[in-house]
């Protein structure tokens, strides 16, 4: 059975939260202290982030938190702030299509995905290129 991607309205976050929280938690753990599970939940409930949920055969297999950024230039981007799941190869194309569609609906100019290096090769096959490199040092 093909995975299904659906956007969850802010009003329904608490209803689906027990199903997506394990995935969000994994994504937060990979965020190097920049996110918290509570903060992601609150942003979703407040409508400051959008939740995409991927499910297959009545089981959630991935969750993504998206946000819109309006840059100083006026450029609008839709970005993946947090993402985790299993069976990536089965749903990645569907997520890319959903990001393109949502971005267009929200009048965005680009999709921005910040992730680990392994994403670069997978996303290049779908028209993405490395925009910049971020480096970090704990102090």
Question: Where are the model-predicted features located?
Answer:
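Short amphipathic alpha-helix that is part of the acyltransferase structural core
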Residues: 1-35
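Active-site rim helix/loop that mediates acceptor-substrate recognition in acyltransferases
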Residues: 29-49
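Sterically constrained small-residue positions within well-ordered secondary structures
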Residues: 43-45, 57, 71, 104, ...
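Conserved donor-binding loop and adjoining core beta-sheet/short helix segment
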Residues: 48-89
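Short glycine-aromatic motifs
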Residues: 48-49, 125-129
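Acyl-donor binding region in acyl/amide transferases
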Residues: 75-124
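Conserved catalytic-core motifs of GNAT/GCN5-like acyltransferases
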Residues: 114, 129-139
């Amino acid at each position: 059975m093909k995975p299904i991607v659906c956007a969850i309205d802010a009003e329904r976050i608490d209803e689906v939260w027990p199903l997506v929280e394990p995935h969000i938690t994994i994504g937060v753990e990979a965020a190097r202290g920049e996110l918290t599970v509570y903060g992601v939940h609150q942003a979703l409930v407040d409508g400051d982030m959008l939740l995409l949920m991927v499910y297959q055969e009545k089981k959630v297999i991935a969750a993504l938190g998206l946000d819109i950024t309006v840059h100083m230039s006026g450029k609008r981007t839709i970005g993946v702030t947090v993402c985790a799941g299993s069976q990536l190869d089965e749903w990645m194309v569907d997520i890319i299509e959903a990001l393109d569609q949502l971005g267009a609906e929200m009048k965005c100019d680009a999709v921005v995905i910040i992730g680990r290096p392994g994403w670069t090769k997978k996303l290049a096959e779908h028209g993405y290129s490395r925009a910049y490199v971020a480096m970090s040092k704990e102090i």
